[in-house]
């Protein structure tokens, strides 16, 4: 079975229209979306009519959920991580699962977009 991939997808800081076309394409095509705050993320996903299974992934469950994410990717699923605003892993959850991807030789991709730095 072919492995899936993890995508770190930046989300707009403020205006929902600031999301990239590539980010929308990835969100429309992944199997699952891990979200820092599912309520906040649903605003974005509903705005763009993206209907994908969503689960919470935040600083309080990041360690355990990261293991589940890696397992699912190894089983062939493609998973996106999004935060409330900006790029996952920069002042937001994401760095733990990326470290585990490196340790486990699991493919991941960081999309360009808004960050807490900009």
What are these regions (language model features)?
Residues 61-70:
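Glycine-rich, highly charged phosphate/nucleotide-binding loops
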Residues 50, 62, 74-78:
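Generic short alpha-helical segment signal, independent of protein family or function
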Residues 20-21, 66-67, 91-95:
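Conserved strand-to-helix beginnings and helix N-cap segments that scaffold or border functional pockets
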Residues 36-39, 60-61, 85, 112-115:
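Short beta->alpha linker loops
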Residues 74-118:
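Short glycine-cluster motifs
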Residues 1-60:
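Glycine-rich, flexible N-terminal cofactor/catalytic loop recognition
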Residues 23, 41, 68-69, 97:
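Residues within well-ordered alpha-helices
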Residues 46-51, 73, 94-95:
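Glycine-rich loop at the start of a catalytic domain that most often binds anionic cofactors/ligands
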């Amino acid at each position: 079975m072919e492995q899936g991939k993890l995508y770190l997808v930046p989300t707009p800081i403020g205006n929902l229209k600031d999301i990239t076309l590539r980010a929308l394409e990835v969100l429309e095509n992944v199997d699952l979306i891990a979200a820092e705050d599912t309520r906040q993320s649903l605003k974005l996903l509903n705005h763009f009519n993206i209907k994908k299974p969503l689960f919470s992934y935040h600083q309080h469950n990041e360690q355990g959920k990261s293991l589940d994410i890696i397992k699912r990717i190894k089983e062939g699923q493609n998973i996106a991580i999004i935060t409330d605003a900006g790029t996952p892993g920069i002042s937001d959850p994401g760095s733990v699962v990326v470290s585990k991807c490196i340790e486990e030789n699991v493919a991941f991709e960081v999309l360009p977009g808004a960050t807490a730095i900009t």
